[in-house]
Design a protein with these regions (language model features):
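Charge-dense, helix-prone N-terminal extensions
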Residues: 1-117
Length: 117
């Protein structure tokens, strides 16, 4: 799947921006990454409640192997039923963006460095 196909899939959601990163593609809306495309699958940011819903739809947690360890990032695969259904993909994307916004709001703001005289 290329960037144009990702944008088409989420067209009912609204404009998304794709950014290549780490051999995959980050999927952004409103300046926040809410999804990613890697290893031939789309995954969405999820909290525990959304992960439970996604698991019920047959999704799996996004994970990869690095240095002999399995790494999980808090993303879950887009359900197969939504891969060819832009309206369903949009519904899932809205939930993932809500979670990305909440995560961004809960991060402590960085203090600006004051110049030393």
């Amino acid at each position: 799947m290329d960037e144009a196909a990702i944008e088409d899939l989420f067209a009912a959601f609204g404009p998304v921006r794709c950014k290549r990163m780490f051999g995959g593609i980050g999927i952004y809306a409103d300046g926040l990454m809410f999804g990613l495309f890697a290893f031939d699958q789309i995954s969405l940011k999820a909290d525990a409640e959304f992960a439970s819903l996604l698991e019920g739809e047959g999704s799996r947690p996004f994970q990869y192997e690095a240095r002999g360890r399995s790494i999980k990032l808090g993303y879950w695969t887009l359900p197969d039923s939504a891969v060819d259904d832009p309206d369903a993909a949009a519904d899932f994307a809205r939930q993932a963006l809500r979670i990305a916004r909440a995560a961004a709001a809960s991060k402590p703001r960085k203090k600006q460095k004051t110049p030393k005289n």
